[in-house]
Amino acid sequence: WTSFWQSELEFHISDKEDTPLDWEKTEFQNQVQIFDFENFAAALYFSYNFVTENSEGDEIEYKYLNELYNDELGLITNFIFEKQVGSRAGGSTTFDLSNYFYIKELFFELIDFGLIGFSDFGEISKFRVFGEQEHQYGFQLESGFELYDIDYEWAIGYLHGLTDASANHTII
């Protein structure tokens, strides 16, 4: 972290009904903060996702993030746009939404707990019907520490699929 920029590395592992445990993608993202007021912040994200599923191309992802927070609670909402790239790319830009409601320092005054959810509505040019959309919701634990003037954060979570198109279980 700096006062306005951070980078993250995420690993997405899922368990769909008809497949074994699957390493879905590895995501490298950068965040640039637009503003940070006392209880409200916004940022832009850019990420490149290395997709390991055979039938899909890698992804370029853009996000706009809003965060409302105080000393005890927070709510983060992301508006996400993804476009597949590479030789296996297909389709137009997709629209996703994610929400994360968290309670700060709930466990041992050092681990945050939150309810987290992701919704994939489909391509911007044609949203899918609800049963064909991907919706996963669950919980997440996270914490952080500082080492040699650098902030490090970790998070782990579980998501449960709500539609047939969603992975049944995902660890994030």
Enumerate the language-model features and the residues they cover.
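Transmembrane beta-barrel domains of Gram-negative outer membranes and organellar outer membranes
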Residues: 1-171
